Amino acid sequence: MGYTIQLDKDGDYCWDEDPTHHDPYMQANTTSHTAVSRAAMAAPHVAAHHAFHEPFIKLNLTDKNIFNGLGFILIVIFIYLLLITLQQMLTRHIYNTVQHCVKAHLDSKNLQ
């Protein structure tokens, strides 16, 4: 279930609908887009500009492949940076705690 949204070189969106996907909004848009494409083919001067939408950005929106491509890489980088930050915070906390304990221990030795 899903559909592929494509962005062509003019910045216009077009999409290929998956036959297993049943979204009336997308079907209505697909129908209107097909009608616009047919109207463009009827007018030669418009057809020269919009004859074929050659996609250079493909965004695949499916239920199965949520973690694919660039999104997956960005999620991995985000988790990696989060882990580094947490590790640094924990290290600083442990260092400060040990330093405090050592200082308290030395102060108690000096008082005796």
From Swiss-Prot:
The main place the protein resides is host cell
Annotated membrane topology is: Single-pass membrane protein
Q: What is this protein called?
A: Uncharacterized protein B117L
Q: Which residues are glycosylated?
A: N29, N60
Q: Name one GO cellular component term.
A: membrane
The entry's localization annotation reads: Host membrane; Virion
Q: Which domain of life is it from?
A: Viruses
Arranged from A to Z, the UniProt key words for this protein are: Glycoprotein, Host membrane, Membrane, Transmembrane, Transmembrane helix, Virion
- Transmembrane helix as a keyword? yes
Q: Which family does it belong to?
A: Belongs to the asfivirus B117L family.
- Annotated transmembrane regions: 66-86
